[in-house]
Amino acid sequence: MPKNTPSPSDPQHYFSESPQAPSRRKEFAVSGTDGKLTLSTDAGVFSQHGLDKGTSVFLEVMAKHDCAPIEPGSFLCDIGCGSGAIALTLAVRYPACTIYAVDTNKRARDICLENATRNGLTNIVVKAPEEVDPSIVFASMWSNPPIRIGKSALHDLLELWLARLDTDGTAYLVVNKNLGADSLSQWMTALSYPTTRIASRNGFRVLEVKTTR
């Protein structure tokens, strides 16, 4: 694991399974062409102070991006969902699809489900990674992946979930350019997932990842 990267066992860190940090709830809004959402977040959850810059950039870009059509009844996923800003946006944008919001962090999962209920979204399923039915094939994945878990763990995570995309599926990721966005793009392309940068803004890259199976 890279130097100065917190250990996944750190009880205060967002990728801990059961963070022990005292609860400090905060509310924030997510606005876009698909409407306005009101969410809560908490200590021990990714972006505990509100909507983080990377996710904000990602949602702005994706609101205008011409994505391939998604068939009603499809499964979509947000890996590392945190409090649910991306997953809830997907649920609003694709009301006829089922959105899997996936996170190792139980506090994040609880808050994400609470946020979905609060916003009247019934097409979100919140799960820990190991709880997701391995037979499910996803039409698309949107994610602000947990870069700080370390390069090797991140590669393992992405390799696992990219393999679960449909044969014509697409993943969209946002990655800080100073935390390896370009090298990650090259790695995914070398892994036979052709990756294109569709936007670069405020220090973040938004990547489109295709399947070639």
Regions found by a protein language model. Give the residues of each.
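Class I S-adenosyl-L-methionine
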Residues: 10-24, 180-213
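A short glycine-rich, Lys/Arg-flanked "PGG" loop and its adjoining helix->strand segment in the class I
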Residues: 155-167
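N-terminal auxiliary segments of SAM/dcSAM-dependent transferases
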Residues: 1-33, 44
